[in-house]
């Protein structure tokens, strides 16, 4: 089995459980003086003058094609339900980050406005039911996996949006700038940030009983996919165990569906080697399918 990268064929090499432990332990908490920060902002896209009307997939496709020609400093991507996301470059200060993303948002809004569309900064769509815009194997597999716990996964994929803050892990040494302290502090701030950004009390045009219906959806998805490891004095070890013991969402297959045995963890995959042996690329992909409140990304 091989990967085709830039026209070159690269053999896939299986990874063992011990190799996975070493890789996750070594790459997910890169330490050093905390200097840079970034932000990822997701937006719902609605009709400018009639936001209760759904935007057709053809219109979304046309406006996203137009946006590809707009020079932006942030990376522009599209979420499964057609939500728009801007991911900033690493910035040396908060003001630099805000200025850059604000300028990009102005440019994006101008293009959308020409087509009668607008960005809406809500955590959950108050009117529309989930509807997939992107038809890709990754999202087919994600939908199948999340459907096992109920409808919340489809709402999360297609009708939710968020603000995600990216910061350096911190120094190896203990103290207020150490990564252990910053990891703990990020988790403590989670509830505060959820409350501060809570602006989505409706779904289907009815109150859900939550100020943040987006947070409700994550709670309904469950801790295996949307939870994090237990906080202790060894974040690297705790995160490594969490990654290995989390269910695999999908096994990529160039010639067919990405289905996976229900409940199979990555640890079990490294031991059973079925439906095929896992590779480093599979590990990297598995890391992108875990959605804890705080995720170490190797920054």
Predicted regions and their residues:
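Loop-rich catalytic cores of soluble enzymes, especially ATP-dependent carboxylate-amine ligases
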Residues: 123-149, 156-157, 166-295
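Substrate-recognition/cap regions that form aromatic- and gly/pro-loop-enriched pockets
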Residues: 299
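Terminal catalytic/cofactor-binding subdomain
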Residues: 1-153, 159, 184, 198
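Short aromatic/hydrophobic contact patches that present stacked aromatics
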Residues: 85, 164-166
């Amino acid at each position: 089995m091989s990967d085709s990268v830039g026209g070159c064929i690269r053999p896939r090499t299986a990874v063992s459980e011990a190799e996975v432990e070493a890789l996750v332990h070594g790459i997910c908490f890169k330490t050093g003086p905390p200097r840079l920060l970034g932000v990822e902002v997701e937006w719902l896209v609605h009709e400018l003058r009639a936001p209760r009307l759904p935007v057709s997939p053809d219109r979304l496709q046309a406006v996203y094609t137009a946006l590809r020609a707009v020079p932006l400093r942030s990376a522009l991507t599209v979420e499964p339900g057609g939500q728009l996301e801007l991911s900033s470059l690493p910035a040396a200060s908060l003001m630099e980050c805000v200025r850059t993303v604000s300028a990009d948002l102005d440019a994006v809004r101008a293009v959308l406005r020409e087509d009668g569309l607008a960005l809406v900064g809500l955590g959950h769509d108050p009117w529309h039911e989930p509807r997939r815009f992107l038809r890709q194997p990754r999202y087919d597999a994600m939908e199948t996996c999340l459907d096992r716990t109920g409808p919340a996964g489809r709402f999360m994929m297609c009708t939710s949006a968020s603000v995600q803050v990216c910061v350096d892990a911190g120094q190896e040494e203990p103290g207020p700038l150490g990564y252990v302290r910053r990891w703990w502090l990020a988790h403590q701030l989670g509830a505060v940030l959820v409350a501060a950004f809570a602006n989505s009390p409706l779904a289907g045009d009815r109150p859900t009983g939550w100020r943040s219906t987006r947070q409700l959806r994550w709670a309904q998805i469950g801790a295996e996919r949307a939870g994090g490891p237990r906080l202790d004095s060894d974040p690297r070890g705790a995160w490594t165990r969490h990654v290995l013991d989390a269910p695999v969402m999908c096994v990529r297959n160039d010639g067919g569906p990405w289905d996976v045995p229900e409940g199979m963890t990555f640890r079990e995959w490294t031991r059973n080697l079925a439906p095929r042996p896992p590779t480093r690329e599979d590990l990297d992909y598995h890391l992108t399918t875990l959605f804890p409140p705080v995720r170490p990304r190797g920054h």
